[in-house]
Amino acid sequence: AMQALFLMALEPIAETLADGNSYGFRKYRSCADATDQIYKCLHKKTSAQWVLEGDIKGCFDHISHEWLLDNVIIDKEMLRKWLKAGVIEKNVFHMTDEGTPQGGIISPTLANITLDGMEALVAKHSTRRDNGKTYSNKVNLVRYADDFIVTGDTKEVLEEIKSELIVFLKDRGLELSEEKTLITHIKDGFDFLGFNIRKYGNGMLLIKPSKKNQKKFAESTHEVIYKMRSAKQTDVIGKLNPKISGWANYYRYVSSKEVFSKLDHIIFLQLRRWSIRRHHDKSLKWIEKKYWQHDGKRGWIFGTKGKDKKGKEKIYRLIQLTHTPIL
């Protein structure tokens, strides 16, 4: 409760000082806003060609307590108590000498305050002089919590920015992961917040669900279906639907049509295996009739009749990713 009160006092100050293109843990901002900003920075023919993909090692765990105490406008004694409160891991209490309070509602704001200022650092490199002329370096920072990218016209300008970011972060007790912090050409593409962002041969920039997240999602539906191999069909649908709609809503703002179609097919195959396992001795036609319903344009849908909590008859149907409108 005390943290919530302090957060109410701290948030307006943090908002005033916040980087313009920081999108994580801030009111009225989302991942969709972050990807939209990246699109604006990279989609034109004349846009930056290079991207610095930043990866901060265990950001929440390593922020310097000294830096926070010196820089956060909040009661120092109270902040010191929270920072030293420690964490309980596997029922063992550990004292903490660095990082923000685990699970504390104030932690995301403290992390944002720590990383604000990166945008000003990047902006210092906005232009370069060459043969008496001034050129734009096309530098932009987009940050979501501790994930960030910096765009740039050349690899060299991003190398310079990276060197300065290393110093900026060191002051705050943080460091970049050497193996995960990469400078990538936009034609090779990069992953950010579960999206893959890449400019193709025709000059078109496409944002799609990342391969890694597609795989993760297919594995998670497989796990649900496998664990529920002897459950009722209505329960399987009840478990899968929130998972499917959550994933579809996250990716509905980008080029997801093909991926949605592919994953719908994977889920269909997973459920077909689930139904065949239950009825080894029955024909595919019998199984299809029992577990699938034909719905005009939508084709075959995994569904059945059941009863709701009040005992009323209800039709239970599996949501399909492709039925989510792409915005």
Can you name each region flagged by the protein language model?
Residues 84, 172-239, 243-245:
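A conserved non-catalytic segment of reverse transcriptases
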Residues 8-24:
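Charged boundary/loop elements
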Residues 1-7, 31, 35, 39:
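Duplex nucleic acid-engaging cores and interfaces of nucleic-acid transaction enzymes
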Residues 20-21, 26, 33-189:
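Conserved polymerase palm-domain catalytic core
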Residues 270, 275-327:
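Extended C-terminal regions of large enzymes
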Residues 1, 155-156, 258:
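A generic structural signal for alpha-helix starts
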Residues 4, 8, 12, 66, ...:
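Short, residue-level hotspots on alpha-helical faces of the histone-fold
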Residues 224-285:
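Right-hand nucleic-acid polymerase module
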